[in-house]
Regions:
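Surface-exposed acidic, glycine-flexible loop patches that form ligand/cofactor-binding
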Residues: 58-66, 111-115, 231-234, 262
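Flexible glycine/proline-enriched surface loops and loop-helix/loop-strand junctions
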Residues: 32-38, 87-88, 175-184, 225, ...
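Short, solvent-exposed loop/turn and secondary-structure capping segments
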Residues: 82-87, 132-137, 253-256
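A short beta-strand-to-alpha-helix junction
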Residues: 94, 157-175, 184-196, 262-267, ...
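Beta-strand elements within well-structured catalytic alpha/beta cores of enzymes
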Residues: 53, 68-76, 92-107, 120-128, ...
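Secreted, luminal/periplasmic, and some membrane-associated catalytic domains
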Residues: 2, 13, 90, 105-249
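C-terminal, low-complexity/hydrophilic appendages and adjacent surface loops
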Residues: 237-238, 244-277
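His/Asp/Glu-rich, glycine-adjacent segments
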Residues: 1-67, 76-83, 206, 210
Length: 315
């Protein structure tokens, strides 16, 4: 049976005043409820990844010929059981300590099986984190609650007052509102005009930072903010309207037990290259993810992917 306890004495961990600072102990035996769901959010899952990697290197033809192979591994470094940092601050810190050891074990494994001189490592992170609880009032951070369902209802009332009776809002999901294209077409209305008018209406809501129409994202002028919105937009599957909520506000879904706090703060993530004759160096310049593939290709002295438009990093 696996048991997770702090790897260091309690005084080695740091806490903010409102964080829980009591030692933890989690068991992952066969009789526990949701054992595997909890296990995959613990640092023990990274040890399982290493065991699977060792089995792969022993039983497959990976790294056994002259043709370069790609092995992509994902380690977990998030909150235990998707709790907030306030609830599991010690677990979060302990996870990072154990993650460091898991990566060290992987390097030792690769060195034994393949040889570090034959491998190029690329370590990156998504910067993703589970939604946190709202900031306590003692920090005096502005905030509020934004209800997407109420917003969609009011938008439909506005469109009915403007264009006549009908269900103009078809549905809403994940800060996106989908309009009823069949109704708009049957009324012989201009879809782009309705999208833009709807965006102008939504921007007046409390808690709304920006409202983007599909027409604006596809045909409007470029800006850094527009570029970020476009990266997550698909013209055939995304909504007609994309709502950007102010940081500090909580997006509440009344029909489901789901809510999350919007945060726009930058979450830096490391990008580490090791091997392939790369000299030790620290580059403190923001790097776009599109430069990873050409950099790896350059280090291996092969051509970059045919859809790659970025240039490699200079070491």
């Amino acid at each position: 049976d696996m048991v997770w306890e702090p790897i260091y004495p309690i005084n080695r961990y740091t806490f903010l005043p409102e964080w829980r600072d009591q030692p933890f102990k989690y068991k992952f035996d066969s009789e526990r409820i949701n054992k595997f769901r909890r296990l995959i959010t613990s640092p023990f899952i990274n040890d399982e990844v290493n065991l699977l990697t060792e089995e792969l290197l022993e039983k497959s033809t990976l790294a056994k010929d002259e043709i370069p192979d790609l092995l992509a591994l994902t380690y977990y470094a998030g909150n235990y059981n998707h709790k907030s940092t306030q609830e599991c601050a010690m677990e979060m810190q302990d996870t990072y300590v154990r993650l460091d050891r898991s990566i060290g074990s992987l390097l030792d494994l690769i060195d034994r099986k393949v040889g570090l001189h034959n491998v190029i490592f690329c370590i990156a992170s998504t910067g993703y984190a589970d939604p946190e609880a709202p900031d306590l009032g003692l920090y005096r951070i502005p905030g509020g609650e934004f209800y997407l369902n109420r917003c969609a209802t009011l938008l439909n009332m506005y469109l009915m007052a403007t264009y006549g009776e009908g269900q103009y809002v078809e549905t809403y999901y994940n800060q996106q509102i989908y309009l009823n294209h069949k109704l708009i077409e049957s009324k012989q209305l201009n879809l782009a005009e309705i999208q833009n008018k709807s965006a102008d209406f939504l921007i007046q809501f409390s808690g709304v930072n920006e409202a983007y129409s599909a027409h604006r994202l596809l045909s409007g002028p470029w800006s850094p903010q527009i570029e970020l919105a476009r990266n997550g937009f698909h013209r055939k599957r995304s909504g007609d309207l994309l709502i950007d909520v102010l940081p500090g506000w909580t997006i509440v879904e009344e029909n489901v037990t789901d809510s999350r706090v919007v945060r726009h703060a930058d979450v830096p993530a490391p990008l580490i290259f090791l091997g392939g004759g790369i000299k030790p160096e620290t580059i403190r310049v923001p790097v776009n993810i599109t430069r990873i593939a050409p950099t790896l290709s350059s280090a291996m002295r092969i051509r970059a992917p045919n859809a790659c438009t970025a240039t490699p990093l200079n070491f």
